[in-house]
């Protein structure tokens, strides 16, 4: 990854929006302990966010993406706000209920989570859209079109299990626990958090 330039072919005017997903990396890892790949990826994501904020490119950054966004805005992450693998209740704020990405979600909905660190304070120049008991900053908006989400709306129960399996070396839980969580989550009728992705695409897409 340290050899890949993700922005080499990126032109702001050619895209409707950008999705930045999670990763096994922890932003709060001391700089001296980060791999070259992690440092390069973080740098590339920060550069992309800078372009997006300057050019008005819509972005939805989830998990690791939110943590890099918070750091870019001057707010650190902490293991104090990590969440164990499982389902948690997400509470939409008043600003969130007025936002097009969350407007059709209930005031409280369940999402699958599992992250070592989180953001404890709302970063400067951003609006808090959603929160949870153990992780105060679950979703923010910066400006009109850059979003960060600690939960991963792109992951339904099946994809959540695949992600945990792929990141098993990073300490994301044992297979038995994941199987139980996924079984319980799959019993619900709808992947409610997935509406965030759908609404992002619908609201910002253009030909």
List where the protein language model places each region:
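Pocket-forming structural segment of enzyme catalytic cores
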Residues: 73-158
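Flexible gly/pro-rich beta->alpha loop and the following alpha-helix that scaffold active-site loops
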Residues: 1-60
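Glycine-rich, phosphate-binding/catalytic loops in enzymes
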Residues: 34-38, 76-78, 129-130, 165-167
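Acyltransferase
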Residues: 155-207
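Gly/Ala-rich beta-loop-alpha elbow adjacent to hydrolase catalytic centers
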Residues: 61, 65, 70
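Short aromatic-enriched loop/helix-cap "lid" or pocket-rim segments at secondary-structure transitions
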Residues: 14-15, 32, 140-142, 159-163
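Active-site metal-binding loops of divalent metal-dependent hydrolases
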Residues: 23-24, 66, 116, 153
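Alpha-helical elements of Rossmann-like donor-binding domains used by nucleotide-donor carbohydrate transfer enzymes
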Residues: 17, 47, 127, 162, ...
């Amino acid at each position: 990854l340290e050899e890949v330039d993700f922005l080499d072919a990126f032109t702001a005017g050619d895209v409707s929006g950008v999705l930045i997903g999670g990763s096994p990396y922890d932003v709060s890892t001391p700089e001296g302990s980060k791999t070259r790949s992690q440092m390069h990826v973080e740098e590339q994501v920060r550069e992309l966010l800078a372009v997006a904020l300057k050019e008005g490119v819509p972005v939805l950054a989830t998990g690791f993406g939110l943590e890099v966004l918070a750091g870019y805005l001057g707010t650190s992450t902490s293991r104090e706000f990590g969440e164990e693998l499982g389902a948690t209740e997400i509470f939409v704020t008043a600003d969130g209920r007025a936002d097009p990405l969350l407007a059709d979600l209930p005031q409280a909905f369940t999402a699958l989570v599992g992250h070592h660190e989180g953001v404890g304070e709302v970063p400067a120049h951003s609006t808090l859209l959603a929160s949870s008991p153990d992780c105060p900053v679950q979703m923010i908006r910066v400006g009109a079109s850059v979003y960060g989400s600690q939960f991963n709306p792109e992951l339904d129960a099946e994809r959540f299990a695949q992600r945990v399996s792929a990141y098993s070396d990073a300490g994301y839980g044992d297979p038995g626990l994941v199987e139980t969580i996924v079984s319980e989550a799959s019993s619900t009728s709808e992947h409610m958090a997935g509406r965030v992705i759908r609404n992002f695409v619908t609201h910002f897409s253009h030909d």
